[in-house]
Amino acid sequence: MTQKADATRRFLLKGGIAAAGVAAGSGAITGFPTIWAQNIKNVTLRQFGTGVSALNAIASKCKEDTGITIQMTAMDTDAAAQRAITQPRSYDVADIEYFTVKKVFPANVLQPLDVKKIKFYDDIVPLFKTGKVTPTASIGQGTAPCRVSFVEGETSLKFAGAPTEWMTLIPTIYNADTLGIRPDLVGRPIKNWRDLVDPAFKGKSAIINIPSIGIMDAAMTMESLGTMKYGDKGNMTKPEIDQTIAFLIQKKKDGQFRAFWKSFQESVDLMSSGEVVIQSMWSPAVTAVRSKGIQCVFQPLAEGYRGWGGGLGIAKHLTGLERDAAYEYINWYLSGWTGAYLNRQGYYSAVLSTAQKNMTPNEWGYWMDGKPATAAIVSPDGTEIAKVGDLRDGGSYYDRIGKIACWNSVMDNDRYLVQKWNEFSVA
């Protein structure tokens, strides 16, 4: 998914990253005695996470509906994982990505979450439980969320091989990433990951400069070329890392890459200007380019997508009223408004049934069912992003999520990867 704080803005909303708690508004909540519920309204929860979901609009709506104040702080993925581990008393709720759970949860800073307290647990998509959205779908290589979703018990730090009553995070958001292209400038159909390094696009392609994600895009490209076959792209051996980095360095020396971007806005600017015609990209960045009236496609590719997901965890130190408020917040989060809000940006929500109730049939048809828009599609800030008759790139939910080939990961050789990636960066 992300890095760099301004770099993590994978969304179109102006002023979307939350910097502070929201104090206005209130609303009734249910499920607690009156006095208890009134006390919960006085609770402030400190949450940190990436810019994908650390959004003022979510905190504001939560305050309006539940009375709970959420103080949000946005940061990049690596900083979020580091804070979770090294400053466990500085937050109450951790909004982190699943691939970082391999680092964070064994540090004993988050508490296993009781699924019996999650109102919509049974409605959470199976991707986070069994790993498959359909019986025939593959789970994909790397740190698929289901591999780190559960622990063996209430006090356990050991990941469970199958669903238990204790989750590491309650899932909230996920997506399938691919290459972004300028169809008006590439001059031919784009069908494969190997097109990223086609000499025809020399000096006009770009790759994300985040080791854990860029290496995946490179691996998808090399397998597409037929020059490498990985045992597990999400957990490479040192020789596999060496070969992948050597490939990237050679392509860099050949002048293939125009840029190595870290931020959402960088990727938008590169594509909007036409400096780059094919690159690693995020769905809302494609939307941002389109909102300028410029053709841009989030291109489905034959080899599949790279997946990522995130969720909410509760700090180990949280107890009593504050912990109950955190569970209430999570239950509110899954109740539909937030899911619809995220879906409208091109992400997917963990509980589809409640999100659907907060979307129009036209919105649901466009974003989820792969149907042509019957009216203009607008983002949460009102920007028109699709016209009547337009289709979402990649088709339906099942077409996209069912074709994830690998997931963002923390490799066993992560430190070695970062070292080698730095060699590529300065080459």
Residue ranges of predicted features:
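Extracytoplasmic ligand-binding site segments that recognize negatively charged/polar headgroups
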Residues: 53, 105, 110-266
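Conserved C-terminal helix/tail region of periplasmic/extracytoplasmic solute-binding proteins
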Residues: 383-427
